[in-house]
A protein has these predicted regions:
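Non-heme Fe(II)-dependent double-stranded beta-helix
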Residues: 1-13, 18-111, 116-120
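Short, surface-exposed loop/helix-turn segments at secondary-structure junctions
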Residues: 113, 159-173, 201-203, 221-230
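Short, conserved beta-strand element in jelly-roll/cupin
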Residues: 86, 119-137, 178-179, 186, ...
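Double-stranded beta-helix
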Residues: 135-196, 216
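Short, structured patches in soluble enzyme cores that scaffold and shape functional sites
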Residues: 97, 102, 113, 130-134, ...
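Non-heme Fe(II)/2-oxoglutarate
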Residues: 40, 44, 191-192, 196-291
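Phosphate/oxyanion-binding loops and surfaces in catalytic or ligand/nucleic-acid-binding neighborhoods
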Residues: 36-40, 89, 135, 151, ...
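Glycine-rich phosphate/pyrophosphate-binding beta-alpha loops
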Residues: 114-116, 125, 189, 194-198
Length: 291
């Protein structure tokens, strides 16, 4: 369980690092599970490739639904104790993914707030980034802007359309999250974060289960909302009968064209790719409004 100082640090800075929350045995089991999912003989290929070579996998979708190792890790009691301390006693599993930066590849992830992709009635949403390799500047560790969650949701639009990247981030304020394997970064849904490409000879693989308070409900439209909700699972406490609503207005993630991932919408490849070649995520699409 987190102490008061750690909880306050998360509230103040929008993130919290707990080193080596998972031991080497748990980490190695997860790495072995990745190898199983990437086995060429595996008929299910729930992943996305790096565009540079078309062979290196940069993301595995919904690993908790694909392998028991990740389902168990996402429900680890020590991990959930931390989540409960940060967002309250009623905890829902939201979604999961595996982000992987291959050696000498590893796509850039531009500055963004996770909440921009899935606005909810309140902001008690947190992602646990579980590092399965040592994370360093050279292999593209995560970077965060401390306290940026206090700014609220910023625009992630380009030319009137959602592009999943925040404009005008002051990178001089950023902190590099360099941690050993088994460590966890708890990230507030409004904290600005990014990562560079991997310039090292070593991979950087990260498992990301996301959680939300039971009284936080999605407010965006499009089939993506319904798609995510089908995987929601109550992990602690009880389901909510009411939606807790923060005051304010949120810009909805309405894109120019359908896309399958953060990578595609940030790099703009969704504007060029055939829809059949993307596992589209169901985000709403509309014409830009007149200015």
């Amino acid at each position: 369980m987190l102490n008061r100082q750690q909880i306050q640090s998360y509230a103040d800075h929008g993130y919290l690092v707990i080193e080596k929350l998972f031991d080497s045995e748990q980490v190695n089991r997860s790495l072995a599970a990745i190898d199983e999912l990437l086995d060429p003989n595996n008929p299910d290929k729930p992943y996305e490739y790096e565009p540079q070579d078309g062979e290196t996998v940069r993301r595995i979708w919904s690993p908790t639904q694909k392998h028991a190792a990740f389902k168990e890790m996402a429900a680890d009691p020590h991990l959930l104790d931390c989540i409960e301390a940060l967002i309250g006693e009623n905890v829902l599993f939201h979604y999961s993914k595996l982000n992987m930066k291959g050696p000498k590849v590893g796509s850039v992830v531009e500055w963004h707030q996770d909440f921009s992709y899935y606005p909810h009635t309140n902001t008690d949403l947190v992602t646990a980034l579980i590092f399965l390799d040592d994370a360093s500047v050279t292999n593209g560790c995560l970077r965060v802007v401390p306290g940026s969650h206090r700014r609220g949701l910023v625009s992630h639009e380009v030319d009137g359309f959602f592009r999943g990247k925040a404009q005008g981030t002051d990178e001089s304020l950023a902190v590099d999250i360099e941690v050993p394997a088994g460590s966890v970064l708890f990230l507030h849904c409004l904290t600005l974060h990014a990562s560079a490409c991997n310039t090292s000879q070593l991979p950087r693989r990260t498992f990301l289960p996301a959680y939300r308070a039971a009284d936080a409900f999605p407010i965006y439209f499009g089939s993506h909302a319904a798609h995510n909700e089908s995987g929601i699972q109550l992990l602690r406490g009880r389901r909510a009968k009411i939606a807790r609503v923060d005051a304010g207005a949120y810009l909805l993630p309405i894109a120019e064209r359908e896309f399958g991932s953060l990578y595609e919408v940030q790099e703009g490849s969704h504007l060029r790719k055939a829809l059949a070649s993307m596992e589209t995520a169901g985000y709403a699409v509309t014409e830009p409004t007149a200015s």
